[in-house]
């Protein structure tokens, strides 16, 4: 199959297995959920009644005081006591096979092509690391919410995009399923397309 280059009167021949396969919603969902789960920090920590600081002595005798019975100042009922079901550090990552991950990326890229959300260009760059230059370029292309993928990371482009809302710049090696579906449009250079094809082959 062929992808038309928007900035040139030509087309780029690409593999149908990467850019023309059926959309597997279940697979994409599973991989996106796993990717998001892996990004969770998981460092929350609370103390149980066994871990909080305090004496093990019974605060007052069982009977005769008129007060409610109590066995420990570390009881979860008490102020500064332990937490009943204390949260502990946790690894939320889920296992995803390479074949599944690649399949999900291919499925997303194919769907972007079908929905006309993938724009392929010969090259995409700015002369200097200036936000104004990139903003003007995107305005000319009628793009606002966009992910720009280049073959190698263009430092000028990366720096120019940092202060633009809903604009991100990645190199081909750094793409992930969440970023591909998060933006309204995806702009890829011809080099990036070839690199992604090789990566997912």
Swiss-Prot record:
One of its GO terms (molecular function) is structural constituent of ribosome. Coiled coil: none annotated. SUPFAM superfamilies: Ribosomal protein L4 (SSF52166). Transmembrane segments: none annotated. The keyword Ribosomal protein applies. GO terms for cellular component: ribonucleoprotein complex; ribosome. Residues 44-71 are annotated as: Disordered. One of its GO terms (biological process) is translation. Keywords: Ribonucleoprotein, Ribosomal protein, RNA-binding, rRNA-binding. Belongs to the universal ribosomal protein uL4 family. Part of the 50S ribosomal subunit. PANTHER family: 50S RIBOSOMAL PROTEIN L4, LARGE RIBOSOMAL SUBUNIT PROTEIN UL4M. One of the primary rRNA binding proteins, this protein initially binds near the 5'-end of the 23S rRNA. It is important during the early stages of 50S assembly. It makes multiple contacts with different domains of the 23S rRNA in the assembled 50S subunit and ribosome. Forms part of the polypeptide exit tunnel. This is Large ribosomal subunit protein uL4. It comes from Pectobacterium carotovorum subsp. carotovorum (strain PC1).
């Amino acid at each position: 199959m062929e992808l038309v280059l928007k900035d040139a009167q030509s087309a780029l021949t690409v593999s149908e297995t990467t850019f023309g396969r059926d959309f597997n919603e279940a697979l994409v969902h599973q991989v996106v959920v796993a990717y998001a789960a892996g990004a969770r920090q998981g460092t929350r920590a609370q103390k149980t009644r066994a871990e909080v600081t305090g004496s093990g002595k019974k605060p007052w005798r069982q009977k005769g005081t008129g007060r409610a019975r109590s066995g420990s100042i570390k009881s979860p009922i008490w102020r500064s006591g332990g937490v009943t079901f204390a949260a502990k550090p946790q690894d939320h990552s889920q296992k995803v096979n390479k074949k599944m991950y690649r399949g999900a990326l291919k499925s997303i890229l194919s769907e972007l092509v079908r929905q006309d959300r993938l724009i392929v260009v010969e090259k995409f760059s700015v002369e200097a690391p200036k936000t104004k230059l990139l903003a003007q370029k995107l305005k000319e292309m009628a793009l606002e919410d966009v992910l720009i993928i280049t073959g190698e990371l263009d430092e000028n482009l990366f720096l120019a995009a940092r202060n633009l809302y809903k604009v991100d710049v990645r190199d081909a090696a750094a793409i992930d399923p969440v970023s591909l579906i998060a933006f309204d449009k995806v702009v890829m250079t011809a080099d990036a397309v070839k690199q992604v094809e090789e990566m997912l082959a």
